[in-house]
UniProtKB/Swiss-Prot annotation:
Keyword Nucleus attached: yes
Record-linked InterPro entries: AhpC/TSA, Peroxiredoxin_AhpC-typ, Peroxiredoxin_C, PRX_1cys, Thioredoxin-like_sf, Thioredoxin_domain
Protein's recorded name: 1-Cys peroxiredoxin A
Gene Ontology molecular function: peroxidase activity; thioredoxin-dependent peroxiredoxin activity
One GO cellular component term noted in the UniProt record for this chain: cytosol
Compartment(s): Nucleus; Cytoplasm
Family note: Belongs to the peroxiredoxin family. Prx6 subfamily.
Species assigned in the record: Oryza sativa subsp. japonica (Rice)
Length: 220
């Protein structure tokens, strides 16, 4: 489905939420934000997901990342449901705001509509979409899951770490990368530039092609 994707500026929508009116760009400010949708309040997978989000809030806070949820349910429904979420996982307090989009206009603009899932009135429900939005208000990364598959919070944290490392050091992260492991030098950086930029040195993989495009280094 066409719509908001990596590199696009997130729409500056204003919606009611469990924390009052929220304008998305003001909420982002100069931080990273995880903007995520869920299909519906008082549903099983969503309850486990939002409880997990609450449990990981400290990890995101350490990284300067804020959480912002959205679904088509109204604010009172969100507030009532939060009681269930916190009872399901005692100690995981839902301190992040959840926006309400009963008209479904916001989820359309945010590219969060699930074409296969509908409510009892035939209205499309949100997918399990998640956009990581940067301080420049642009989408840096997106996950899109169907209603039947819950998200992996460890992977969301890893993706945040990878994005922030890449932005800070102008590098890329290889498959299954975790903080502290080697990163790769982008192909647009020459060896001479790499020597200047990465005085700690770098290793070039010895490949049959003889091309020196796979270069690893360590960053702090």
């Amino acid at each position: 489905m066409p719509g908001l994707t990596i590199g696009d500026t997130v729409p500056n929508l204003e919606l009611d939420s469990t924390h009052g009116k929220i304008r998305i760009h003001d909420f982002v400010g100069d931080t990273y934000v995880i903007l995520f949708s869920h299909p519906g309040d008082f549903t099983p997978v969503c309850t486990t997901e939002l409880a997990a989000m609450a449990g990981y809030a400290k990890e995101f806070d350490k990284r300067g990342v804020k959480l912002l949820g959205i679904s088509c349910d109204d604010v009172q429904s969100h507030k009532d449901w939060i009681k269930d979420i916190e009872a399901y996982k005692p100690g995981n307090r839902v301190t992040y705001p959840i926006m309400a989009d009963p008209s479904r206009e916001a989820i359309k603009q945010l590219n969060m509509v699930d074409p296969d899932e509908k409510d009892s009135n035939g209205g499309h429900l949100p997918s399990r979409a998640l956009h990581i939005v940067g301080p420049d208000k642009k989408v840096k990364l997106s996950f899109l899951y169907p209603a039947c598959v819950g998200r992996n919070m460890d992977e969301v944290v890893r993706a945040v770490d990878a994005l922030q490392t890449a932005a800070k050091h102008a590098v890329a992260t290889p498959v299954n990368w975790k903080p502290g492991e080697r990163v790769v030098i982008p192909p647009g950086v020459s060896d001479d530039e790499a020597k200047e930029k990465f005085p700690q040195g770098f290793d070039t993989a010895d490949l049959p092609s003889g091309k020196g495009y796979l270069r690893f280094t360590k960053v702090g």
